[in-house]
Amino acid sequence: MTCDLCTDTARHVVTVKTSSISELQDAPAPGSQFGYHLHFVASDGSHHAEIIHWDKEQRKAVVDLSMRDVPKAEMLTVLDGRLINTGVPHYVQHVEDLEHFDVVGEGRRLRHHPDLGPEGANVNFVEEKPDGTLSVRTYERGVEDETWACGTGVTACAIVMNNHDIHTRGGDFHVRFRQVCDTYTDVHLIGPASFNFAGEILKKDNQIIRRSDIQTI
């Protein structure tokens, strides 16, 4: 999904490009002059997102995104960690000295491990900090490398570690959830979103035939 934000003196406009849109509406954000509510359907079901803060100059937002419920029975003990599906499968493993940990090497080794299912899983390494928060680094399948942050990965680590405040290289996140009987429900991921770049890539027969200049912000 891509989301382009445009404001003028008359109104706020949100353009959303995704495979399935069920609802889009403007709504005032509490305590601010800017707010959007968005409902969309992804591969793991329906989601609700709200932009709760928007910095027009920096083109940065804070987003509150609802996530899928997670039955406790789906959180499995595997290898030296836990396997959980927060929209896509994530393996979560506790480590020491995360800053110097070989995330790419270990992530690549574990990503296709047969115990993580036929399609493998994203791999998250998490360290508990002295202040009680968590630091997380994620090796993402598909990307096949470490990424700055992964929303479903942050959510997975929060639930597995029963913690709500997560630090990543891409920013700080808060995950809100509660356990009702045997299900983690009312799961919300709250954190930063920013405009990073814009560009166009055209492919023909799986070959890139034209790539426009990419503007990095």
Please identify what each model-predicted range represents.
Residues 1-149, 156-217:
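Active-site proximal loop and beta-alpha junction motif in alpha/beta enzyme cores
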